[in-house]
Design a protein with these regions (language model features):
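N-terminal helix-turn-helix DNA-binding core of bacterial DNA-binding proteins
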Residues: 42-89, 112-119
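Short, hydrophobic-biased segments on the C-terminal half of alpha helices
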Residues: 66, 94-95
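Functionally engaged cysteine thiol sites
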Residues: 75-77, 100, 134-135
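Alpha-helical residues within the helix-turn-helix
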Residues: 81, 92, 98-99
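Short alpha-helical linear motifs
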Residues: 89-93, 131
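Beta-hairpin "wing" of winged helix-turn-helix
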Residues: 98-108, 115
Length: 140
């Protein structure tokens, strides 16, 4: 069974000549060409900030810490028991979460008590919603 090929236009699109499918070309033209498309993409500084946030979330240990802190503020000794890693590794992970303002630590006597920030709570809720939507689409 032969596959039908999509009709491709060989016309000037944007500021250069490339072969692209007609629907893609039409949508690109509607957006103002390549310049219009590029105007919708965040600048490199914003993309760098977003990538660092996603890197912070891309580790199961850090997600475990954040989810534990959703329940209540915790001291390092309890967090260490939850994630079962060495002090140096835990410190590394906590610092990444603090740098992204996902958690905060407050000195209380001899302890540092960690809490999830509003930003951290919002990010977790957002990823949870996204995850539920993905599971719903896969189940359909």
């Amino acid at each position: 069974m032969a596959m039908r090929r999509k009709r491709i236009l060989k016309e000037k699109c944007c500021d250069f000549s490339i072969d692209i499918p007609v629907p893609i070309q039409n949508e690109l033209i509607r957006k103002g060409g390549l310049k219009g498309l590029l105007s919708q993409i965040p600048d490199s500084a914003e993309l760098l900030i977003n990538s660092r946030l996603h890197q912070a979330l891309a580790d199961p240990i850090r997600l475990t810490v954040m989810n534990a802190l959703l329940s209540q503020p915790l001291c390092v000794c309890v967090i260490k028991e939850v994630v079962k890693i060495a002090d140096s590794k835990l410190s590394y992970h906590l610092n990444i979460l603090k740098e992204q303002e996902l958690i905060s630590g407050e000195q209380q006597g001899n302890w540092i008590i960690y809490s999830i920030t509003d930003r951290g709570r919002q990010v977790l809720k957002s990823t949870e919603r996204s995850e539920k939507e993905m599971r719903g689409r896969v189940a359909s």
